[in-house]
Amino acid sequence: VKQAAAVMAMAAMPGVIQSASEEREKGLTLKRSQIKVDDQWDVIIVGGGPAGCTAAIAAAREGAKTLLIEAMGQLGGMGTAGMVPAWCPFSDGEKIIYKGLAEKIFRESMKGVSHEPENKLDWVSINPEYLMSIYDRMVTESGAKVLFFSRLAAVEMSSDDTIDAIIVSNKAGLVAFKGKVYIDATGDGDLAAWSGASFKRGYDEEGSVQMSSLCFSFANIDSYDYINGPTLYVWKDESTPLYKAVRSGKYPLVDTHFCNNLVGPDVIQCNAGHMTVDTTDPWAISEAMILGRQKAVQYLEAMKDVRPSTFSNAFVVKTASLLGVRD
């Protein structure tokens, strides 16, 4: 009942997610004494985002028997499951500054956004399905093995303070994996933290963190009007349509964060809305996912109001399956 009330209260406190895990903490001693062990690996990487994928490719190319473990059902992390709409700048303003695998993946991904100029290096749109296929191909061609829908659950340490095994939860139950080298590419530092590495949460003594966002996409927009009409959002420019929607007071879940990119014919992808979330609390993250989807719907309603020429026939085609966590 308390959890349902907390979800219902979110509309009254937009963007603020309270931690509820403290009320639920009780102990249970596991009776299971043995689980299966897979100990054939040279390198085990936890997390299949850009860092995990490139680490897996590099290790496998050097001949290491490599396993890439990913909690979701796709590689790419925030660029695919998280639906971040564009690459951050790849240049110093004149020339590309990221080489090797990063440049190769970036160049390949541009084939999935044919409307982008070939020489563009900064804020290039991402087609998440196309990018996903690139990671699948490059990782598997390198010889690395991929295990999807498998989440790190625990870390077993040896007496000399090194990792003895990692425990993963998936459809087979709890499974232990052993390797000679372990790489933490979780994005949250889970493997390192659960191995006993020290860490600091947040950017101040109170543990404050940057706000999170849930990305989403709109389909059936008017691309011509989107490209040639007024810019939807410019930071601190209150003449842009988004500020008009916020000032109206009709859309309490909409704030002045609305980065957006055309990712295909009549489809834009948006990094929009802010939520203050304890990103170490699974209950808070769960509530943020619900609130993020509500925000996506309300952003569309707001855009239909202030920019009907672009959005009158649009609909929410997808919301991300991974929360955009900045801290």
Residue ranges of predicted features:
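N-terminal export signals
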Residues: 1-19
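Conserved N-terminal/central alpha/beta ligand/cofactor-binding core
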Residues: 4-7, 58, 64-65, 70-156, ...
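C-terminal segment of N-terminal export signals and the immediately downstream linker at the start
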Residues: 14-43
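Flavin (FAD/FMN)-binding glycine-rich loop and adjacent Rossmann-like elements that form
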Residues: 30, 34, 105, 149, ...
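Loop/turn elements at helix/coil->beta-strand transitions in domains of secreted/extracellular proteins
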Residues: 40-42, 62-65, 142-145, 175, ...
